[in-house]
Amino acid sequence: YNNTGGGGGFATGTLAVTGGQVLRISAGEGGYGVINPSPNPQGQSATEFFGAGPGSTGGAGIAGVFTTNSSTPTCHSAPGVYMVAGGGGGSGGFASGIDGGVGGGTIGGAGGGDGATAQANNNGPQECSGGGGSQTAGGQSLAAGPQTSAPQITNGAFLQGGSGSYGGAGGGYYGGGAGGRPGNQSPGDRVGAGGGGSSYVGHPQITCGSTEAGEACMSSGGSPDP
């Protein structure tokens, strides 16, 4: 099987700035997929990018324009966020057709299938895949199954993807949810993909703002734009 991480979202708009104003820019890092037989989704080290949630297949980080330190998500508040392009979720594994959810649009894609179904704060369309982030809430993360070593499961949140054992969540204005695994955790069970994060252009100083969701097969939104 060959599953891909979700394509990143796209955000555009005009920001009027003043002399001496300092803006900090975050360039989003792409998420990860998995190709059978290697690497094993459980065997990969979890790489965590700015705003992305940890998981066996990494979700993509946030691309955005901020007024505060863009290396630490907890340092931000909503008034200091001008624009965000949501990151795609990491893929699932052990079966085909479990791609990571795409970055939004106003709503990130839920993990599973081709990852392009916009679905906010809910389970993904495939078993145990994470939901996409919206403008007001993060995507839902799925349980990791009966593992004594499973990390804490958290849903997506403001500027932060959810955490889990499997498909990593994409970062965004509100991050996606992490993928889980069925409760019986039998060998060969499907591993859920992470949901994508939402994009944002709603700051009052942004004019002519618009967003575009990513596409299946890791194609980013806004690809015709420079």
Spans of features found by a protein language model:
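Short consensus segments that form the blades of beta-propeller domains
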Residues: 2-4, 52-56, 164, 185-192
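Secretome/extracellular-domain signature
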Residues: 3-129, 139, 143-145
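N-terminal targeting/export leaders
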Residues: 121-123, 129, 138, 194, ...
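Extended serine/threonine-enriched, polar tracts that run as long, contiguous segments within proteins
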Residues: 146-165, 178-179, 183
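C-terminal subregion of chymotrypsin/trypsin-like serine protease catalytic domains
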Residues: 178-226
